[in-house]
Amino acid sequence: MVVKTWMPWLLVSSVLSQGCCQHWSFGLSPGGKRELKYFPNTLENQIRLLNSNTPCSDLSHLEESSLAKIYRIKGLLGSVTEAKNGYRTYK
């Protein structure tokens, strides 16, 4: 008797969980579909950006976060101590 009432509730809960977790991204269109009227503008902007002759070497505005620096140093120190202990990591 318990199994007979348990199975329909399991089915209903699984269907409801899928229904309420549906991803609606751009303009409430399912699957992230965009209207075609926006496509030429973005495509033209991308082509214009690719054809621009601006140098990309100026990266002074980008800074590494302190947390990223800590993890990078931690990885470096870990590899140095493993090398001293005779461990070798193969990738």
From Swiss-Prot:
Keywords: Amidation, Cleavage on pair of basic residues, Hormone, Pyrrolidone carboxylic acid, Secreted, Signal. The keyword tRNA-binding does not apply. GO terms for molecular function: hormone activity. Expressed in the cell bodies of a cluster of neurons in the preoptic region. The modification Glycine amide is found at residue 31. The modification Pyrrolidone carboxylic acid is found at residue 22. It comes from the Eukaryota. It is found in: Secreted. One of its GO terms (cellular component) is extracellular space. Residues 1-21 form the signal peptide. The keyword Signal applies. Stimulates the secretion of gonadotropins. Teleost species possess three paralogous GnRHs: mdGnRH and cGnRH-II have been identified in tetrapods; sGnRH has no tetrapod ortholog and is thought to be a duplication of cGnRH-II. Belongs to the GnRH family. This is Progonadoliberin-1.
